[in-house]
């Protein structure tokens, strides 16, 4: 059995051109011969792409052969090859260069109509696939998969995909507004006139570490997630999801602007409540300041209890009693009781009593360390001193966690831990011996967060009119 595939090009005047596509032949029906093979499908798509591109470019060239003002034919100065990388193969287009007509003044003597229209050598569709896939998996694996499923007649290298991703991400960076010290606009009188806002926004920020190149060690990546409680005008079937963001702290020059744009994309108003949860680091907290007049900055309970848990584990290793004879006194039970008391006071936001208890604990451990010379006691003393310093620096950000918990309010940023794992670890750390430059990691994170937020396709629609027209179908959520 033979198959012949034809493609018919119909011009605006109704004239038809028939183009023969690669013929197919089938004999006995077998599972392996059922339908088209991947190689045949790629070959057919490549041929169709070539015919469609030839007809499109020929129509564009014909529209510019005559002067639009006087109608006289333009002289051809020459032709040059215009290579275009598409999803269905690399195509070399013959691009003529026309001489401008003398009936009107022009800035240049000649022009190339195709070069003016096709300013980039990679089509948006292929560029979208390269950047989206490489944000979810390694550059090398992206090149292999694209080569496997698309009719690529020339090798696709990981370095090419990395360069394309960095160029596209840099375009995003150039669109980002200028950094500001404060993004609060207006006054209370103006804010009172605003419509009722949506539900509170909860923003959690944490950090992760990525291995640097050229023996530079590791550098920190700040990642976070913003959750909207509810939307007033949301439909019953509308599902509210958080938006993640990330940046390399030592490279990014606009961290506050970046976070503000994420919040604004979720409908942030100046009269809307915003809660920021962080680990208490100064660099992280500075990013959150002066973004909203209704903002509340809280210390993440997870980081508080994590430090206390370490102290409790260390306290179990200190001697039960210190001294001999009449001077002997209990240490371990007393220390454990003091730590539990400190945790209770911190849970209820009573930092004054917690600090007093910490000072008492330090005095007891200092005396015990001098009497026993025990290593665990000294280690516990150092940990208690560090905890006291931590609480003193962040005491104004320690709320009544118990009351918030009973009211159903967030006290910990567990959702941020999953965001850091999703944004950073899955692509850049776990099970992959990757080394990164700060610029390369930062630019990749900008693409990855937009892909995970399901905003990347809309970005390409804004850049390239006609790219993937919007349909009523719900987008498929990314799992990686």
Which residues does each predicted region cover?
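Catalytic center-proximal scaffold of phosphoryl-transfer enzymes
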Residues: 1-47, 95-98, 102-480
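N-terminal helical hairpins
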Residues: 51-55
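Short metal-coordination and nucleic-acid-contact micro-motifs, chiefly zinc-binding Cys/His arrays
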Residues: 56-66, 80, 93-96
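Charge-rich, acidic-biased intrinsically disordered regions
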Residues: 66-68, 191-192
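Short cysteine-rich clusters marking metal-coordination/redox-active sites
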Residues: 67-70, 100-101
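Short recognition patches in nucleic-acid-associated and regulatory proteins
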Residues: 73-91
């Amino acid at each position: 059995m033979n198959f012949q595939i034809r493609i018919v090009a119909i011009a605006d005047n109704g004239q038809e051109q028939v183009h023969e596509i690669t013929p197919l032949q089938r004999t006995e029906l077998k599972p392996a011969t059922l339908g088209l093979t991947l190689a045949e499908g790629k070959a057919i798509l490549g041929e169709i792409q070539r015919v469609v591109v030839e007809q499109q470019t020929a129509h564009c060239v014909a529209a510019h052969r005559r002067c639009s003002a006087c109608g006289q034919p333009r002289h051809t100065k020459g032709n040059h090859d215009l290579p275009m990388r598409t999803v269905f193969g690399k195509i070399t287009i013959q691009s003529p260069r026309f001489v401008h007509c003398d009936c009107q003044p022009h800035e240049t003597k000649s022009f190339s109509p195709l070069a003016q229209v096709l300013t980039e050598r990679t089509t948006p569709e292929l560029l979208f696939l390269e950047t989206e896939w490489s944000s979810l998996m390694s550059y090398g694996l992206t090149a292999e998969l694209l080569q496997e499923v698309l009719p690529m007649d020339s090798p696709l290298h990981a370095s090419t995909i990395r360069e394309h991703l960095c160029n596209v991400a840099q375009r995003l960076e150039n669109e980002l507004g200028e950094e500001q010290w404060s993004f609060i606009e207006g006054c209370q009188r103006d804010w009172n006139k605003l419509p009722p806002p949506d539900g509170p926004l909860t923003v959690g920020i944490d950090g992760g570490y990525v291995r640097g190149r050229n023996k530079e060690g590791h550098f920190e990546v700040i990642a976070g997630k913003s959750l909207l409680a509810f939307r007033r005008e949301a439909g019953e079937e509308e599902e509210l999801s958080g938006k993640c963001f990330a940046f390399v702290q030592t490279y990014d020059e606009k961290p506050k602007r970046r976070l503000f744009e994420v919040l604004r994309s979720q409908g942030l108003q100046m009269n809307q409540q915003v809660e920021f949860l962080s680990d208490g680091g100064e660099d992280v907290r500075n990013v959150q300041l002066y973004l909203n007049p209704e903002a509340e900055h809280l210390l993440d309970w997870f980081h508080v209890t994590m430090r206390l848990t370490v102290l409790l584990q260390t306290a179990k290793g200190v001697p039960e009693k210190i001294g001999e004879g009449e001077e002997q006194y209990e240490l371990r039970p007393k220390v454990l009781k003091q730590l539990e008391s400190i945790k209770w006071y911190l849970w209820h936001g009573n930092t004054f009593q917690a600090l007093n208890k910490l000072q008492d604990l330090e005095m007891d451990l200092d005396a015990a360390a001098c009497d026993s010379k025990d290593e665990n006691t000294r280690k516990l003393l150092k940990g208690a001193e560090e905890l006291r310093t931590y609480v003193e620096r962040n005491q104004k950000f320690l709320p009544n966690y118990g009351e918030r918990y009973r009211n159903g309010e967030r006290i910990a940023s567990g959702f941020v831990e999953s965001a850091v794992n999703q944004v950073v670890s899955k692509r850049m750390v776990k099970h992959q011996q990757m080394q990164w430059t700060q610029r390369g990691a930062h630019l990749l994170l900008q693409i990855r967060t937009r892909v995970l937020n399901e905003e990347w396709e809309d970005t390409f629609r804004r850049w390239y009119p006609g790219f993937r027209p919007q349909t009523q179908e719900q987008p498929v959520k990314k799992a990686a």
